[in-house]
Regions:
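An edge-strand/N-cap motif at the start of beta-rich repeat modules
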Residues: 35-40
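Structural detector for internal amphipathic alpha-helices that build alpha-solenoid repeat scaffolds
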Residues: 12-32, 49-63, 71, 79-93, ...
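Polybasic, Ser/Thr-rich amphipathic helices
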Residues: 1-15
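Short inter-helical turns and helix N-cap capping residues of alpha-solenoid HEAT/ARM repeat scaffolds
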Residues: 46-47, 76-77, 106-107, 136-137, ...
Length: 401
């Protein structure tokens, strides 16, 4: 019989009919024997099988083995690290303090097992972990916030929000990740404020969390589009694009907002999301009083592609001056897909439509427009003939290149 098994038999045995005090006296005696020392040696220095047996066996024996089990979290073999974490989880509350202190170990593999043990312990670990958010060691603060996130400890949210301002970037990054795991909407505002963090890793974690929070993030992110800080604007845009479909309806509604920066940012995001449901509303923005908003609407419609051509052609023919001009720019940006619809209006009753269509076809430079433009050289309107000639010259030059 091996030393581990002998010890456990002695440790767990009780005399039939003996009282509890007598059994615990036997335990205390055993702790002073060489058997106990040898058991600790087996736990920390034995071969893989011996260490594994020891780790799996001491869960019911309690506090005396916390130290060696903490050491087991640093073992070279994953099976020992995982077994040590599971056993510490069984020991429970007495292991919480030593586990939190062990976060000072820099290894990610060790930290993962500490977090696992604390998660297994659960409720008794919550308050000590929350208090550890104020610890003077950054690795302990980082580990504490990571564990609270994995445990989805909602009561810790105020403390984790404060940790978004921690001087250590690792703590700030883990705080953003933890808030995503917990999923509390009250985190959205502070997270958006952290979009301009000095560290890219923190900014990326914040964006990922805002995206995972979904709908509660949308309106605050849209408001962030007005931020004068270009980095915040860019990251808010990227977050909204990543959220995607759930943001479309809200973005469409904000195209009527009184703030030009919100209209501009919203139409930009809609173009990048690429949902064609937004086309009719974006078309309305083509005659927005703000030039910057109109420019973004043009870009958005061009990005939306072929489905935008029909409404753009309608605006090209029937819109007011501002809307026609914006539609022309969008059609030019669309390029060759717009060639056939433009060829079709070369015979429009309105000379202005024919002239502008010829101009655009020249700018697009598609060879298949040549014959149709050549026919326009006999147009009764001199301005149309001139534009057709210029368009043909432009196409010829591009072909020569």
């Amino acid at each position: 019989m091996g030393i581990t098994k002998k010890f456990l038999n002695l440790f767990k045995s009780g005399k039939a009919g003996g009282d509890e005090e007598e059994e615990w006296e036997e335990v205390r005696i055993l702790e002073r024997t060489a058997h106990y020392d040898n058991f600790l040696i087996a736990l920390s220095e034995g071969d893989l099988d011996t260490r594994w047996s020891a780790v799996r066996s001491v869960g019911d024996l309690g506090e005396p083995f916390i130290g060696p089990l903490i050491g087991g979290l640093k073992d070279e073999y994953w099976i020992i690290r995982r077994g040590s974490a599971d056993t510490l989880g069984k020991i429970g509350a007495p292991a919480v303090g030593p586990l939190i202190a062990a976060f000072q170990e820099p290894g990610e593999d060790v930290r993962q097992e500490i977090v696992r043990a604390l998660q297994l312990i659960g409720e008794p670990a919550a308050d000590p972990l929350t208090q550890a958010l104020k610890h003077n060691h950054p690795l302990i603060r980082r580990g504490a916030v990571q564990a609270l996130g994995v445990m989805c400890e909602t009561r810790a949210v105020p403390g984790i929000l404060e940790s978004l301002k921690d001087p250590d970037s690792g703590v700030r990054q883990e705080s953003a990740v933890a808030l995503g795991r917990i999923g509390d909407p009250q985190a959205v505002g502070p997270l958006i404020e952290t979009l301009n963090d000095a560290k890219e890793s923190v900014r990326m974690a914040v964006m990922a969390t805002l995206c995972s929070l979904g709908e509660p993030s949308i309106l605050p992110l849209i408001r962030a589009l007005t931020d004068p800080n270009d980095d915040i604007h860019r990251r808010a845009t990227l977050a909204l694009v990543t959220i995607g479909e759930p943001a479309v309806e809200i973005l469409i509604n904000t195209l009527g907002d009184q703030t030009p920066a919100i209209r501009k940012g919203s139409v930009e995001v809609l173009g990048q999301i690429g949902n064609t449901r937004a086309i009719p509303t974006i078309m309305d923005v083509l005659d927005d009083p703000e030039r910057s908003v109109r420019i973004e609407a043009v870009k958005a419609l061009a990005a939306l592609g072929v489905p935008a051509i029909a409404p753009l052609m309608q605006a090209f023919r029937e819109g007011d001056v501002m809307k026609r001009t914006s539609a022309m720019e969008a059609l030019w940006m669309l390029g060759q897909p717009a060639t056939t619809p433009l060829i079709m209006v070369l015979k429009d009753d309105q000379s202005d439509v024919r002239k502008r269509a010829a101009l655009l076809l020249g700018e697009i430079g598609d060879q298949k427009a040549v014959d149709h433009l050549t026919g326009l050289l006999a147009d009764q309107n001199v301005a149309v003939r001139r534009e057709a000639f210029e368009a043909l010259e432009m196409i010829k030059k591009r072909t020569a290149q």
